[in-house]
Every structure is written in C-alpha cells, then in structure tokens.
Amino acid sequence: MEKFDIIHEFKVLATKLKEDDRLVYLKQARNMNDMDQELQELIRRFNLAQYNYQIEITKDDMDEAKVTELNDELQDTYSQIMENDSMQEYNACKAEVDTLVLYLQNIIAAAVNDGDPMLVPEPVDCNGVCAGCSGCGN
C-alpha cells in the first residue's frame, strides 16, 4: 500500500473516531462547562488572580504578604474549579478519552515495531499518566 493510501485510511478512521461515545461525551461535557456560569466565573476569578500574581512577583518591590494572599486565592479558586460538578464530569470523560488515545498509540507502536497490533491489550483502569503507576507495561 502506498504512503498516501495509508495516511488517507488513517484519516478516515480518525474521522470515525469522533463518533465514539467517549468523544461524544467529552464534547458534551466541554459544552456543559461552557454553559456553567458558576464554573465560568470561577475560571475568570482564577485567571485574574493568576494575572495579579504574575504582576506582583515581577515587581522590584514585591509585597510578600500580597504574593501569599494571591497564591492562597489561586489555590482556593483552583480547588473550587476542580470540585465543580461540570468540571468533574469533564475530567472523568477526558480520562476515558486519554485512555483510548493511549490504547491507539500502543496499537500503532506495536505495528511500527513489527508486533501484532491485534494482540495489544486494552488498558485497564489506566488514566494515561504513568507517574506513580505500578507499571502496566504500556
């Protein structure tokens, strides 16, 4: 098969991938986040605090108390963002998509390394982040 044909077929499969329930749910969760006014306000507060923090730490006469206050505000707002129901749903959906992408990468790697892509096991309870993992071998 020619290189162009392989790329074209891969693009066709990638287009079909967008129909996978995991990607559909991720898109819905992203839209929920966009429509969640409470979450959007928290994100605005976080961005403003981050901006103010960056300005303060670059000042020649930086106010340590102000930096601490802004850092506390950043951490508190970040925690509120991550506790938001819409954000939690999004993160759960994103973790599933990340696991799917990892699986697809492993299939491609098996083929590239002369392995059998059909024998690549599907990740079990994998969040795609290997730090702290006991080692699934993927």
Spans of features found by a protein language model:
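Long, hydrophobic, amphipathic alpha-helical segments used as structural scaffolds
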Residues: 21, 57, 61, 85, ...
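N-terminal leader/targeting peptides and immediately adjacent processing regions
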Residues: 1-11, 136-137
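Amphipathic alpha-helical segments
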Residues: 37-89, 93
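Cysteine-cluster motifs in flexible loop/terminal segments that predominantly coordinate metals
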Residues: 121-138
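Long amphipathic alpha-helical coiled-coil segments
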Residues: 73, 92-109, 121-125
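Long, low-complexity intrinsically disordered regions enriched in acidic and polar residues
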Residues: 27-28, 34, 81, 90-99, ...
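Short, charge-rich amphipathic alpha-helices with coiled-coil/heptad character
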Residues: 7-31
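Intrinsically disordered, low-complexity terminal tails/loops enriched in metal-binding residues
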Residues: 15, 78-79, 105, 117, ...
